[in-house]
Amino acid sequence: MTQADNQNPKPMVLIILDGFGESDETTHNAIKEANTPTLDKLFRHYPHTLLEASGRAVGLPDGQMGNSEVGHLHIGGGRKVPQDLTRIDAAIASGEFYENPALIEALEKAKALNKAVHILGLLSPGGVHSRDNQIAALVELAHRCGIKKIYLHAILDGRDTPPKSALLSIEKITDQFHAYGNGKIASLIGRYYAMDRDKRWDRTEKAYDLLTQGTAQFHALTAKEGLMLAYEQGNTDEFVSPTSIHRHNETPITIEDGDVVVFMNFRADRARQLTYAFLDDHFTAFNRQVRPKLSAFVTLTAYAKDIHAAVAFPPLELHNTLGEYLSARGYRQLRIAETEKYAHVTYFLNGGQEAPFNGEDRLLIPSPKVATYDLQPEMSAVEMTNKLVEIIQNDDYDLIVCNFANPDMVGHTGDETATREAIQVIDDCLKRIITALQSVGGEALITADHGNAEKMFDEKTNQPHTAHTSNLVPLIYVGREAQFCKEVGALDDVAPTLLYLMGLEKPREMTGRNLITLK
């Protein structure tokens, strides 16, 4: 069936409110505290249900909070997708990790040349971009291989973990180095610098110069001392300035010709810029004063097709995702988001497919250039809505997928007032989108990829809560008379439900289920 044969409403708009979780808790809940007349009306008058967006429901370990990458993979995939975190942890448990060909080959090169192995990675138990147990497993593997010079360049979290929580991970890995009698943490830097994904290359340059030249704002004898120094400066883990760890009479440990680098982040989006700085022969984003000629550069997972590195855990291929399935049937699609979430409504929603499918257009709205988004909680939501309303009225597309980044990106700052303002901006944008849809006979499914903004303070740590949550997320249908089933669904049910509303059978690859019945 093509859209020409289908009399279902057009366009269908899938609206993803990034970081918008459901919680009965009203204290420190920016969503409940915000003035949201549009959302209140939608929940009162339109069918809605709740979806699981964490743990096993999205291919993660029990209790592991969801994230944007995983959320969009499941929304677009319509099936349970084993996540890299789960795959790599399983490989460690089974022993396969210690026989991984890409890792073994790189380590053997370092051993043969008597060169150093430099481990880059987010040293964090967060499980969103990395997990510290996996870094520890690589340290163990390097030790087993007889590597004498093992250096960890620790990127600190404080975003998917409490703002000041890095010490435990630092102490654990330091104890491991001491037990082996070789290796050390060579540098510290906050993810704000080392893991930018919005082409703020001045931040990436600071990380690159720390790694290749030892250019540091601070120097410390130990990693713990370096962390305490950052806290004294008023910085939380995320914002730790470039810090070199070495004795006062020694030169900083840097990545040199012949060395091996292993980047231990399993999530690609925030690992790409730093990787390009090392590997791109035509790199122009900043002037690389030093470019080491490496024996090997290994990435834990595949970061991008144009990044030519050995990959320890290649991606699983997904076929007949929502985008691919609709494309094959001649449907026209649009993906629209601002910079911070553009990859999620394109690459991740398409199951790791970089190029658009036939009939799929993409529109990128630039995110504002501010240090942190609490300074501009509206981000680019209004500009995106202006374009979206215009596009809806032009009636060019069968399916439009858009992502509002504000609840997640502002929620990550831990600023409750700013996050509340962000929610209120989104509420006003939703009103305009729904009004435009109803004027042309279109419909909407509104959901989220994971929670965040509904929990802004952590009573246990007595710190602002900047991480995602494991809460359920909403699914609201704005269209014809319908009823959701009583059971709680999951994110992989969104695509089958959407296809049902568009008058289509789901493909056999989609194991998620339709959650709604039209009356």
Curated annotation (Swiss-Prot):
Keywords: Glycolysis, Isomerase, Manganese, Metal-binding. It comes from the Bacteria. SUPFAM superfamilies: 2,3-Bisphosphoglycerate-independent phosphoglycerate mutase, substrate-binding domain (SSF64158), Alkaline phosphatase-like (SSF53649). InterPro entries: Alkaline_phosphatase_core_sf (IPR017850), BPG-indep_PGM_N (IPR011258), Metalloenzyme (IPR006124), PGAM_B_sf (IPR036646), Pgm_bpd_ind (IPR005995). The keyword Isomerase applies. Catalyzes the interconversion of 2-phosphoglycerate and 3-phosphoglycerate. This is 2,3-bisphosphoglycerate-independent phosphoglycerate mutase.
